[in-house]
Amino acid sequence: MIFMKDNIVTVEHLSFTYKDSEEPAVKDVSFSIPKGTWTTLVGHNGSGKSTIARLLNGILLPDDNPETLINIDGITLTEKTMWDIRDRVGIVFQNPDNQFVGATVEDDVAFGLENRQVPRPKMKSIVQDVLNQVGMTNFQKSEPQYLSGGQKQRVAIAGILAIGPKLIILDESTSMLDPAGKFKILKLIRKLQKENELTIFSITHDINEAEHADQILVLDKGSLLASDSPVDIFKDVSLIKNAGLDLPLFYKIKNKLINKGISIPQEVNTEEKLVKYLCQLNSKM
């Protein structure tokens, strides 16, 4: 098997069936994730998204098939390499309370480092650095249970950053936050991703979260319907509808303008750019 050197993740012919089900939860799915990019997997509830997250981390093992492949950072997932894979993948779940193990914020962030037997001076330096990156330095002595939902997710993200994984999976990690909290966390993660060249695989039923991804995967009933850039995915209205999803507001407006004969350049890919472009267009009339 030949791997693209820039792909941190390669998945081929991945299927998984739960023991109490006759129908596969994931059906012959193949995709790749380039290093240092943001890929978003979207699909309605029950489409198989979280199952894929657990398969990538070796929490679940795929159905037996000689053509099936999960390769992360050059390591092919098997029962023998399961722990090597888990060393390279960090997951932030939707409920951070389920991830907390430390009595204080700094203890919790240090937990993964302690398991890796990182020397204490280096550990303290890493903990301080990641807490600073997520804006939680002033809460290092706080007990996690007394933090707000957004603060808890910041601590969970810090704990993942501390161990330096090759791939960070966000499994519905903002679904329990209010819109303002969700916006702040996504803005923070995008900032960290660009500054640290992180590879992000976000999983969500909220298609609005996918607008700024480099790549979108559309999943429905365990099958991968499409894999493309946000611009090309959101141009295909029938694809979005067939997946039981709805277009982000920006693309609804953009598509309606295009259908009315107004040419919108491809680089106009945000609400701010669209408003600016329309104002410029109006001034020329």
From Swiss-Prot:
GO terms for cellular component: ATP-binding cassette (ABC) transporter complex. Its main location: membrane. It is a peripheral membrane protein. GO terms for molecular function: ATP binding; ATP hydrolysis activity; ATPase-coupled transmembrane transporter activity. ATP binds at residues 43-50. This is Energy-coupling factor transporter ATP-binding protein EcfA1. Gene3D superfamilies: P-loop containing nucleotide triphosphate hydrolases. It comes from the Bacteria. Keywords: ATP-binding, Cell membrane, Membrane, Nucleotide-binding, Translocase, Transport. Residues 9-246 form the ABC transporter domain. It is an enzyme of class 7 (translocase). Forms a stable energy-coupling factor (ECF) transporter complex composed of 2 membrane-embedded substrate-binding proteins (S component), 2 ATP-binding proteins (A component) and 2 transmembrane proteins (T component). InterPro entries: AAA+_ATPase, ABC_transporter-like_ATP-bd, ABC_transporter-like_CS, ABC_transpr_CbiO/EcfA_su, ECF_ABC_transporter_ATP-bd, EcfA_1, P-loop_NTPase. The keyword Cell membrane applies. ATP-binding (A) component of a common energy-coupling factor (ECF) ABC-transporter complex. Unlike classic ABC transporters this ECF transporter provides the energy necessary to transport a number of different substrates. Its EC number is 7.-.-.-. It is found in: Cell membrane. PANTHER family: ENERGY-COUPLING FACTOR TRANSPORTER ATP-BINDING PROTEIN ECFA1 (PTHR43553:SF24), HEAVY METAL TRANSPORTER (PTHR43553). Belongs to the ABC transporter superfamily. Energy-coupling factor EcfA family.
